């Protein structure tokens, strides 16, 4: 398994959520078809991610797949469920390993209210381990609209390619961090995602001082 160096990750405001009971986590693993002994780490919480008063179960699980090849030895999955009595009913799933082409690790969940409406959006973090010389942590931001859950933004929140001399062109050997600008994002009612990008190195050369730039990304269409 590829080694993962300690990374500084994006600072996101995580809303207070109810910690899931141990039996809820076990129910999630069972629903996913994952044995408890294969779970490397997990984030399981209850939060309101759909309109209405009811809370849903949101889980990100990092687990051993049982596959022998390095690319697919670990899996990272996000699943969202509603509860029906004692049952968990699947609503949405995101397989980070499938989307990334394997080589994933250290999945985590963040519960975020990006538009201030009281219904939270979902963030799933994971490490991209495709290249030993590139340290990258990624984030998918998932929103819910009339069409259901969808990935509204996906990108790197921590990236360092300064050591990848052979694999990455010189002009892409950057190092940076991204941090959510929650206040500005909420001012747009979640239509635009604001990020502060801190550049530490550019084209393989460390900057004398880190440089911050503001980035914007579309999240939701403007309401008529």
Name the predicted role of every residue range:
Residues 72-81, 125, 135-142:
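"Short basic amphipathic alpha-helical interaction patches in structured regions
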Residues 19-37, 129-224:
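Acidic, small-residue rich beta-repeat scaffolds with periodic aromatic anchors
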Residues 96-133:
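Extracellular-facing segments of soluble proteins and assemblies that are Gly/Ser/Thr-biased and enriched
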Residues 1-2:
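N-terminal secretory signal peptides that target proteins for export/translocation
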């Amino acid at each position: 398994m590829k080694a993962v160096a300690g990374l500084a990750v994006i600072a996101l405001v995580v809303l207070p959520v109810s910690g899931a009971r141990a039996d809820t986590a076990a129910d999630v693993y069972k629903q996913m078809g994952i044995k408890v002994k294969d779970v490397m780490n997990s984030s399981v919480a209850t939060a309101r991610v759909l309109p209405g008063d009811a809370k849903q179960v949101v889980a990100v699980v990092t687990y051993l797949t049982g596959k022998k090849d390095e690319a697919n030895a670990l899996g990272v999955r996000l699943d969202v469920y509603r509860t029906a009595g004692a049952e968990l009913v699947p609503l949405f799933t995101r397989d980070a390993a499938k989307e990334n082409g394997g080589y994933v690790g250290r999945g985590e969940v963040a519960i975020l209210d990006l538009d201030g409406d009281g219904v939270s959006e979902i963030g799933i973090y994971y490490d991209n381990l495709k290249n030993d010389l590139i340290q990258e942590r990624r984030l998918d931001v998932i929103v819910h609209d009339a069409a259901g859950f969808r990935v509204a933004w996906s990108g790197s929140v921590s990236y360092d390619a300064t050591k990848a001399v052979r694999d990455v062109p010189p002009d892409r050997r950057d190092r940076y961090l991204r941090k959510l600008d929650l206040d500005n994002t909420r001012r747009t009612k979640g239509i635009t995602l604001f990020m502060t990008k801190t550049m530490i190195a550019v084209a393989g050369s460390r900057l004398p001082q880190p440089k911050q730039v503001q980035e914007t990304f579309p999240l939701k269409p403007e309401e008529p």
